[in-house]
Regions:
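Short, flexible loop segments at the rims of nucleotide/cofactor-binding pockets, characterized by
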Residues: 16-22, 44-46, 69-72, 130-136, ...
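Metallo-beta-lactamase
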Residues: 6, 91-218, 223-227, 237
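C-terminal regulatory/interaction regions
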Residues: 226-267
Length: 267
């Protein structure tokens, strides 16, 4: 895990950058919202359980959490969910209906502990109101995003994320490094982008444009402040880009060696 930092007001980034070989690093963050009823958005990468819990404990006793919100069930978003539900016995789990079906555990996801998040609705989480949206780009049909009305923060899941050349706590939509990294990541992560109907995709982007969030908080990227319009304009161009070509086995073996040198996972 990296050093945690404040994104905006009382929102803390529990930061981690996963080495990605020649592609650089993939940020894989979770977010802690402090307050009378603390909220954890995402639960970190499953390979980082000990470090994730240590980073969280540096900010708050996990037992004080009242809400754990995940955007979807993938292990880079919900990787430490079981550990968090056990460490925070009074916390309720916020997730989409489909995500609940995919990860249902009779000992952990009991009906009284689950709150279903449905796009188009708003949830009351203690003193916070969370608007629920379907992010414009996603890799799981169970994905939802959360808009915190108090801070104007949009927790956008995979949307607006991207690879970075080095670990960082800042991002700028005008930076070519951000544009290149986000194009590669979202093209690879959501291959359907290259077949999407432009009008339908524009409608999805217009949901974000209508919110005009003060800060966009991707799971896979640094906070993006005051840039939601430019971010949507960038995404709108992605269907016209070349699809990402994944490495073959020989290239994969080279990547493994590069990842070892970076200190990341070798499998």
């Amino acid at each position: 895990m990296d050093e945690s930092y404040t994104a905006v007001d009382d929102v803390v980034v529990l930061s981690y950058h996963e080495p990605a070989g020649p592609l650089g690093f993939l940020p894989t963050h979770a977010y802690l919202i402090k307050g009378r009823e603390p909220i954890l958005v995402e639960t970190g990468l499953y390979t980082q359980t000990a470090g994730f819990l240590a980073a969280l404990r540096a900010e708050i006793d996990p037992a004080e959490l009242r809400w754990i919100a995940i955007t979807h069930e993938d292990l880079d978003h919900a990787g430490n969910l079981e550990a968090m539900l056990r460490a925070a016995p009074r916390a309720r789990l916020v997730l989409s209906f489909l995500a609940m079906l995919k990860i249902a555990r009779p000992d952990l996801t009991t009906p009284d502990r689950v709150l279903i998040a449905t796009p188009g609705q708003a949830l009351t989480l203690g003193e916070r109101r969370f608007g629920v949206i379907r992010p414009p780009v996603f890799d799981s049909s169970a994905t939802v995003g959360y808009y915190d009305e108090t801070t104007g923060s949009l927790f956008s899941a995979d949307s607006f994320g991207g690879l970075v050349p080095a670990p960082t706590s800042t991002a700028d939509v005008r930076d070519p490094a951000y544009l290149d990294g986000s194009t590669i990541f979202m093209s690879a992560n959501s291959a359907w982008l290259h077949d999407v109907a432009p009008a339908g995709f524009r409608r999805a982007l217009d949901v974000v444009r209508g919110l005009r969030p003060e800060v966009v908080l991707p799971t896979h990227g640094a906070p993006l402040k005051g840039e939601s319009g430019a971010l949507c304009d960038h995404l709108e161009k992605l269907p016209g880009t070349e699809p990402f070509r994944f490495p073959d086995d020989a290239a994969f073996r080279v990547m493994l060696e590069q990842m070892k040198a970076q200190g990341g996972r070798a499998a």
